[in-house]
Design a protein with these regions (language model features):
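An N-terminal hydrophobic leader/cap segment in hydrolases
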Residues: 144-182
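Signature of short aromatic-glycine-proline-rich micro-motifs recurring in repeat-based ectodomains
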Residues: 81-90
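Hydrophobic beta-strand positions that form the internal "hydrophobic ladder"
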Residues: 44-45, 95, 137
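A flexible loop/linker signature enriched in serine peptidases of the S9 family
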Residues: 1-10, 24-34, 46-58, 70-81, ...
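Beta-propeller fold detector
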Residues: 20-26, 65-72, 118-121, 160-166
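Short loop/turn segments that connect beta-strands within beta-propeller blades
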Residues: 13-17, 60-63, 111-115, 155-156
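Conserved small/polar residues in nucleotide/adenosyl-binding loops
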Residues: 198-200
Length: 200
């Protein structure tokens, strides 16, 4: 499956619509590639799990793969459905992203020039389908106690507004179990991360 291993290829589209100059870029049997995107400046970015985590990479001017921001978190996810996006370009130098640590999504701004990640205070723990402009980012969001919603982040003020809820049912947070992050050993000395509901 693509979350186990897949390949990223690049080609040029001729005036007649044919693909030309097709070449392999990254990936393979044991490397998963997620969400290839062209930056506004025409640089190819993508997430790769080559270091054990889906981290953001890009192709340099010399054609080499560069790690953009190494972290022990996921900037990617299994593609159970198509069209998911965990990051979006607000500009050449700013990426809005949702990186996952211990099974929980964290909304953040990645400053490409200064290599700094600014986490945004956010009530949501599941953030997907990010899209961005120079002023705003929109995304689908939810949490164990919040119904799914479309939310908007103001990139200047960092304010998050809920634009639309999936339904208008009243939610009572006390009725819901809150999952806890867990980790456990797996094969080859690796560690798996997830969420657990513990009932006592």
């Amino acid at each position: 499956m693509p979350w186990d291993g897949c390949e990223l290829w690049v080609g040029e589209v001729s005036p007649e619509g044919a693909l030309e100059n097709i070449r392999w870029v990254a990936g393979g049997t044991h490397e998963s590639i997620f969400q290839p995107e062209w930056s506004p400046a025409g640089v190819l970015y993508f997430s790769s799990d080559r270091n054990g985590w889906w981290n953001l990479q890009r192709i340099s001017d010399a054609g080499q793969i560069e790690s953009v921001f190494p972290t022990k978190g996921e900037l990617g996810m299994p593609q159970w459905v198509f069209g998911t996006s965990q990051y979006a370009f607000a500009s050449d130098e700013l990426i809005v992203c949702s990186h996952i640590k211990q099974g929980v999504s964290q909304l953040a701004l990645l400053d490409l020039r200064n290599q700094k990640l600014e986490e945004i205070d956010c009530p949501f723990t599941d953030i997907q389908y990010l899209r961005a402009t120079a002023d705003y980012a929109v995304f689908r969001a939810g949490s164990p106690t919040e119904v799914a919603a479309i939310a908007r982040l103001n990139l200047e003020t960092k304010r998050i507004d809920t634009l639309r809820l999936a339904n208008d049912l009243e939610v009572f947070p006390a009725y819901f179990s809150i999952p806890r992050p867990i980790e456990f050993p797996t094969e080859a000395g690796l560690t798996a991360h997830g969420l657990s509901l513990i009932h006592i």
